[in-house]
């Protein structure tokens, strides 16, 4: 076993091969002095060695990017161990994650714990020369050519956005925000690989976000899907086509060929009705609050609303698609049976609300479980959206008889227009309740109700999913109201946050003085009139 003052050799994995996770190793030797320091006796030699390391690292970066762009690379974990295992390369199965990294640099001595990349140290003044160079103890130091501390602030540190293009994920509470990242949940932008613990994974899939399961907090699937609904535009790669999806969601889209188109319809319903409901409010369904912060950073009242609206739109679209024959694994809803007192016959094709609820809960992963407070509230708010669709079910009837009489009537169950559901959820948004952190979780409330002794039900039980909950007070959204149109001057006073507004006079041309031609039915003739209209815009 080498002593602390011995010679350290760092083996760097330089080439990730195609195929089934096979790796070709190309070793690089970094010369170290007897005391563990870089040999700096000859400055010219030291400078030449440093340039060689830089050129070699650039070659590695170019080769990795080339392989990742092909989209065929297996997810392989890059890893270097310390101590007795210094200089070794440890491989794991594709997507196996970074749990193989069993030590982080924590030395506080003047000697770097690892020289030439690998794991750095907070307490020492050295930068890692080559490699990822992840510092220990909370990202204390940057690295020279790799993932540096403080979001790569070192002049030679690669930007996080660049690493995102390599498909690197930092999961959960250990994560850092990236191009599409939020709340330290994920760092994404290119191919996606597996990750575990505090490790880094390099992925192979550059066409869609086919993510490893279990790498994020419980509420991530729902949060990711809702965010995709309000940010995705056009088609994306993957079986779900119209929105980035997890591996399990992509599997659902493969099994049900009608689901991708139905999800696209749900996205259209959610975004258009959200914008209509908040057209003249400071928040107009934009995910941004100010700068690059978005409403998914914390659980605001707006976050609760978009989760409820997305779940409602998915339930509505799937239930309607079943009844219209656009789904392969469902059809009309269950038939109703007539009672003696009814003066009509149940018939027609009911909207399949039951199937819509089931698929929505599965796609958003709303299954029960012991989750954290945010998970439980997001799950509850999504259920509020599903319940809103259920409450808008109505009877649709058609009369049959001679000469338009209604001697016989056939009825079926049909959902109301989605505008009614969106209006109901907007009302629930206005009445939403902020939940104090020390209150019981939603699951505890549900469990306490379930423990009550069973009683014979005399009337339909009232749903518990009637109120939206949130945790954080919403920001002002004043930073995103510039140039927004107001409804009237009084509305500008609120919408423009006191910055004032400008008035534009717009000429409108519209039909007027309409009449029947020569007094006969039914040819209508109209004149065209000009009308001046004031429009108001925030400064």
From Swiss-Prot:
The keyword Secreted applies. Keywords: Developmental protein, Disulfide bond, Extracellular matrix, Glycoprotein, Lipoprotein, Secreted, Signal, Wnt signaling pathway. Residues 34-77, 436-463 are annotated as: Disordered. One of its GO terms (cellular component) is extracellular region. Transmembrane segments: none annotated. InterPro entries: Wnt (IPR005817), Wnt_C (IPR043158), Wnt_CS (IPR018161). Disulfide bonds join 274-285, 322-330, 332-349, 397-411, 399-406, 478-497, 486-492, 496-538, 512-529, 514-526, 521-522. The keyword Secreted applies. Residues 449-460 have a biased composition (Basic residues). Glycans are attached at residues 74, 284, 419. GO terms for biological process: canonical Wnt signaling pathway; cell fate commitment; cell migration; establishment of planar polarity; female gonad development; germ-line stem-cell niche homeostasis; motor neuron axon guidance; neuron differentiation. Belongs to the Wnt family. This is Protein Wnt-4. The gene is Wnt4.
């Amino acid at each position: 076993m080498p002593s602390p003052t011995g010679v350290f050799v760092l083996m760097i994995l330089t080439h990730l091969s195609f195929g089934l996770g096979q790796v070709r190793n190309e070793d690089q030797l970094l010369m170290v002095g007897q005391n563990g320091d870089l040999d700096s006796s000859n400055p010219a030699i030291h400078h030449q060695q440093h340039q060689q390391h830089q050129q070699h690292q650039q070659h590695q970066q170019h080769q990795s990017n080339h392989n990742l762009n092909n989209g065929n690379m297996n997810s392989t974990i890059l890893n270097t161990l310390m101590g007795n295992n210094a200089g070794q390369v440890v491989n794991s199965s594709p997507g196996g994650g970074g749990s193989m990294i069993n030590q982080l640099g924590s030395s506080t001595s003047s000697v770097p714990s690892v020289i030439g990349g690998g794991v750095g140290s907070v307490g020492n003044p050295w930068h890692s020369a080559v490699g990822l160079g992840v510092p220990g103890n909370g990202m204390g130091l940057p690295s020279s050519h790799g993932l540096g501390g403080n979001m790569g602030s070192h002049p030679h540190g690669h930007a996080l956005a660049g690493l995102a293009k390599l498909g690197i994920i930092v999961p959960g509470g250990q994560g850092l925000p990236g191009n599409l990242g939020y709340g330290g949940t994920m760092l994404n932008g290119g191919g996606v690989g597996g990750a575990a613990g505090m490790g880094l994974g390099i992925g192979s899939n550059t066409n869609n976000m086919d993510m490893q399961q279990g790498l994020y907090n419980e509420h991530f699937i729902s949060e990711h899907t809702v965010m995709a609904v309000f940010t995705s535009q056009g088609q994306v790669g993957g079986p779900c086509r119209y929105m980035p999806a997890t591996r399990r969601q992509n599997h659902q889209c493969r099994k049900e060929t009608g689901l991708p188109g139905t999800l696209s319809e749900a996205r259209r319903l959610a975004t258009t009705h959200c914008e209509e409901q908040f057209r003249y409010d400071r928040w107009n369904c934009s995910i941004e609050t100010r700068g690059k912060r978005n409403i998914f950073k914390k659980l605001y009242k707006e976050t609760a609303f978009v989760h409820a609206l997305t779940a409602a739109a998915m339930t509505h679209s799937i239930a309607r698609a079943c009844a219209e024959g656009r789904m392969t694994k469902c059809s009309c809803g269950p038939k109703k049976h007539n009672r003696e007192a009814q003066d009509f016959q149940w018939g027609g094709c009911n909207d399949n609300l039951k199937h819509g609820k089931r698929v929505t809960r599965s796609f958003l992963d709303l299954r029960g479980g012991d989750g954290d407070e945010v998970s439980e509230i997001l799950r509850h708010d999504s259920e509020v959206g599903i319940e809103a669709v259920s409450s808008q079910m109505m009877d649709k009837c058609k009369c049959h008889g001679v000469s338009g009489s209604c001697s016989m009537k056939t009825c079926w169950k049909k959902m109301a227009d989605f505008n009614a559901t969106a209006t109901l959820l907007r009302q629930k948004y206005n009445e939403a309740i902020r939940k104090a952190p020390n209150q019981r979780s939603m699951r505890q409330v549900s469990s306490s109700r379930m423990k009550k002794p069973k009683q014979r039900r005399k009337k339909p039980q009232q749903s518990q999913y009637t109120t939206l909950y949130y945790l954080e007070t919403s920001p002002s959204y004043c930073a995103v109201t510039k140039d927004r149109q107001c409804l009237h001057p009084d509305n500008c006073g609120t919408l423009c946050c006191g910055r004032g507004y400008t008035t534009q006079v717009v000429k409108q041309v519209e039909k007027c003085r309409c009449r029947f031609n020569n007094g006969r039915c039914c040819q209508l003739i109209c004149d065209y009139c000009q009308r001046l209209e004031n429009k108001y815009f925030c400064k």
